[in-house]
Amino acid sequence: MKKVMIYGMGISGTGAKALLETEGYEVILVDDKKAMTSEEAMQHLDNIEFFIKSPGIPYNNFVKEVQKRGIKVLDEIEVAYNYMVEKNLKTKIIAITGTNGKSTTTAKISDLLNHAGYKACYAGNIGRSLSEVLLHEKDLDFVSLELSSFQLENVENFRAYISMIINMGPDHIERYNSFDEYYDTKFNIAKNQDENQYFIENIDDVEIEKRAKQIKAKRISVSKSKEANVYVEDNKIYVGKDFIIEADKLSLKGIHNLENTLFMVATAEILNIDREKLKEFLMVATPLEHRTELFFNYGKVKFINDSKATNVDSTKFAIQANKDSILICGGYDKGVDLAPLAEMIKENIKEVYLIGVIADKIETELKKVGYEASKIHKLETVENSLLDMKKRFTKDSDEVILLSPATSSYDQFNSFEHRGKVFKELVLKIFG
């Protein structure tokens, strides 16, 4: 029997296991918390056909030993894609990556396709693994597939019908040797495409433009500020010279969602989706949870949950959409430059509540740019911050409270979803 080893029992690992077992593989599961440990697994590396590493696991000593022995290291998406090719599945992949906006774009492209009459679902770094979808969802026309840089590190054959990189900004320096390495990894999403496929290109993004010439797919350009295949002019979205919709009529609000919408429109054009159907959808599409989500009003006080903002660029978009708000910010220290965040807060934020292990560093940067010390509240946790606000604000206070942390959650929470859920529960408990 053919043998494979899977390292990590998360969503992608368990999905790959189920898929490979239907193909007659003996699967050896390794997980330092839930199964055979990596130390024990060293004894089982003989006769392994290939090794699947879950995306969140770094290239530790065990993975390096696997590579040293010449065993092929793959990601779950590569295994699932190879299965699609072997089974001659007609499902087409629309692959989405980017530093920010990829989850919203992934989910909304899937929703748009279903609205237009196709059978589609989303998978990947959002919800289910591609392997699980292929096992349980038959006769799909499309899978809208969110891919993180971690999932794109070992691309060999993977190829999407349409691929896109929403934007690229500094992130994950704890994983990569440089930001250039991170950006180059993102571009693996398109490395196997040819002129029979499409790449949607954000021509506003400097890092994307630096690398776009290497793309062999048909390039469809989008821009918020200059003429492109799909672009914004005078607050209206156009395809070529054809007017599609006024930006004010979009149900997804904010400059970041305008960018996401351009990718949806470009996808619709590639697939010849009826423009009235497209417009209809864009006027009713709903935002995802934890993404600039206005979820509660305490009289005039509005509460917005943007827990998905795990990097500075993402928080920048939230601040631009909610100027003069009171910001709750901070969390795990990812080692990124906080000076741009401090400038953004100084120019646009009324007061800031700092939480998490990175609070001192953000405070230092804020003081460097001359942000008033009286506007900085360093209270360690979300709960302490909200309790302080409860003492200060009444239902007549005209305030917007924005949780947009600008970093990861792992110092106090399991995930950004957990952080957002706790924030919402605490707001309802304290103000509800």
Describe each model-derived feature in a short phrase.
Residues 33-47, 381:
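Short acidic low-complexity segments
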Residues 74-79, 216-233, 279-283, 293-296, ...:
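Beta-strand->loop->alpha-helix junctions that form or flank phosphate-binding loops
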Residues 3, 15-19, 23, 119, ...:
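Nucleotide phosphate-binding/pyrophosphate-handling subdomain across enzymes
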Residues 9:
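Glycine-rich Rossmann-fold phosphate-binding loop(s) that bind the pyrophosphate
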Residues 2-3, 14, 18-23, 40-46, ...:
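Phosphate-binding loop of NTP-binding sites
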Residues 23-37:
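NAD(P)-binding Rossmann-fold cofactor-contacting core
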Residues 341-399:
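C-terminal helical cap/extension that packs against the catalytic core
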Residues 29-31, 199-203, 328-329, 348-357:
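Short internal beta-strands
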